[in-house]
Amino acid sequence: MHIPDNYLSPTTCAVLAVAAAPVVGLSITKVKAQLKENKELAPMLGIAASLSFLLMMFNVPVPGGTTAHAVGGVLLSILIGPYAASLALSVALLLQALLFGDGGILALGANIFNMAIAMPFVGYSVYNFFRKQNHETSGVLVGSYVGINVAAFLTAVELGIQPIIATQGGEPLYNPYGLAVTIPAMMVTHLTIAGAVEVFFTYVIYRFVKQVGPQELYTPTSVNTASFVKKIRYVLIVLVVLSPLGLLAEGTAFGEWSSEELAEMMTNVPAGIENGFSFEALFSDYTIPGTNIAVGYILSAITALLIFYILGKMIRTMNGAKVSHA
């Protein structure tokens, strides 16, 4: 679901970045207000970004030789609220693009709009509706399923309208596949396998939190994190250790191909993709020079967690928080 650079036109990227910016700005404002009431939310933002980052490393195979992954957007909304979740997801997507080349730099606004805005807010609204009817578990299941599929549908539409932008000869400049291809390709995968994976991770982690500390779940009036940070660390450790399992799924997710991969699939690569913006991430595809793939995957995960931890500490320090961690 991470759209690479040059698959969307610069105009599309700009429009989606402009659409995402005010929501991210509002999320920052809301989180600042929450931090004034509860300083312990600061480390939780880093934990939430880490959790989503790790979930997105678990690729699963899908028919057609491609892969898919969970995002954790609705899960984070349930744990720390939709605004904090949106901010944490945005930071995770930014780090993925800059450091690991997962998702484009120019397409960052689109990826934030799909995965860090539409998914957590829509999914949380569904969850909250069921919660108010005393069907919280159903809300977790349905909300996470709806959330990831809304994000997938938006991605499919954004990619599918790109063939409109073409050369005088009618050759697409950017993503070459129209809506008749992108919507079925994305939605069949996410309505079945990816949706099930998202629901599974969301439910398992939700049940873990519910059992060890039900008071830690977010409510519109409070977000309790004092003991949550300690408990969720165990989940992060397990996910880091298991992260190389994401390498078992071969192939690239639909719409996330590099120009080289696309060249193997098509006779003519669109000019906008072949000659477009190029950015070489330091640890592209979660590989570390001099290490084997599995070790590189684990080290990439640890690197991300350390960065998110430092960011959490910085936010806490800037807000004058003095939180003691056992």
Task: Map each language-model feature to its residues.
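Interfacial loop-to-helix junctions that mark the boundaries of transmembrane helices
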Residues: 1-13, 36-40, 65-67, 106-110, ...
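Glycine-rich ThDP/TPP pyrophosphate-binding loop and its adjacent helix/strand module
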Residues: 144, 160-231
